[in-house]
A protein has these predicted regions:
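Iron-sulfur cluster-binding electron-transfer modules in prokaryotic oxidoreductases
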Residues: 2-212
């Protein structure tokens, strides 16, 4: 990360700052790109879309493949549960907030919705942090050599999780291990769990699991 920090330069810092300040808008724009790609796939078909994807990939555009996920907006599809009882805070990773499943998937439910459904089956009420579309653990900025910006986004997320968990009263789930790794390194006020870890520790005595 130190080498990347040195290479980032003033331009990198400005770009990182813009992304941090406008993260909600960036997520919205990326969802739009995914919608356009999905529409193109539906209209043109896999073969022609793959050819176009390979051609524009030569110009530096990320390569399109048939497994590219559809656009998804977690903040509009999952919401807080009301009432008392067992509660858990769920923060879907940025990827799972924006991306659903691909066109050929047999199960069309995005991961975030599957997680919420599982928690409901176990009797948990799910709390979603406020302003989720603007929040990020900071890993994106850390990976680009922008530690100060990364720490800023981590602090923003911790504050939102602190509020959502009622000052640490309820556990917090994040569904991406790399994100959770950074969160556990930087956050001290909330109880953090990866999805499988939470299921093993808290749900295994509340649900019946059937191997398929």
């Amino acid at each position: 990360h130190e080498i990347r920090r040195q290479n980032a330069g003033r331009t990198g810092e400005m770009a990182g700052g813009f992304a941090a300040d406008n993260f909600h808008g960036i997520k919205t724009a990326l969802r739009g790109v995914l919608k356009i790609a999905d529409l193109g796939h539906s209209v043109l078909g896999t073969r022609l879309m793959s050819g176009i994807g390979k051609a524009i990939h030569k110009a530096g555009v990320p390569l399109w493949t048939p497994s590219m996920p559809k656009s998804y907006n977690a903040s509009k599809r999952i919401a807080d549960d009301e009432g008392e009882g067992l509660k858990v805070v769920y923060f879907p990773s940025c990827i799972n907030q924006m991306m659903g499943v691909d066109k050929s998937s047999k199960d069309m439910r995005p991961l975030a919705e599957e997680m919420v459904e599982l928690l409901h089956k176990a009797g948990y009420k799910v709390v979603i942090p406020k302003g989720m579309d603007s929040l990020c653990c900071g890993t994106i900025w850390e990976s680009k050599g922008l530690p100060k910006m990364a720490d800023r986004k981590t602090a923003e997320l911790e504050e939102a999780l602190w509020e959502a968990s009622e000052e640490g009263r309820y556990p917090v789930i994040c569904d991406q291990s790399p994100c959770l790794h950074r969160m556990k390194q930087k956050m001290t006020r909330v109880q953090l769990y990866e999805s499988a870890e939470f299921v093993w520790k808290f749900l295994r005595d509340k649900l019946v699991f059937t191997q398929k």
